[in-house]
From Swiss-Prot:
Family matches, as InterPro entries: NA-bd_OB-fold (IPR012340), Ribosomal_uS12 (IPR006032), Ribosomal_uS12_bac (IPR005679)
Protein name (database record): Small ribosomal subunit protein uS12c
Primary role: With S4 and S5 plays an important role in translational accuracy. Located at the interface of the 30S and 50S subunits.
Native species: Nephroselmis olivacea
Assembly mode: Part of the 30S ribosomal subunit.
Amino acid sequence: MPTIQQLVRAQRKRIVKKTKSPALCACPQRRGVCTRVYTTTPKKPNSALRKVARVRLSSGFEVTAYIPGIGHNLQEHSVVLIRGGRVKDLPGVRYHIVRGTLDTAGVKERKQSRSKYGVKRVTKK
């Protein structure tokens, strides 16, 4: 506990909160252009080919973003929307691509959790 004289001499330092998604620049989402679409392997003990894209954002950053869902239509020069959210078993992947917006199509034949994958409700006839 500092004395009053110590507080007069030097004010208390504020704790600076570091953001987990700096490329978004305090925005909920950002638009970007895919520069490379590829697959990568996760950390141990998992094994898969995870679909990711290197995206140049409108904020000037170039980030790696995960493509969620089964199948996608992304290729180089596709315009995508990026949101925050890391992928635990892919080091360096701190962003997700939003499905069903801009050039990204929604997941085909998705019945549950549709809003997360950009799928409209199917109407029964």
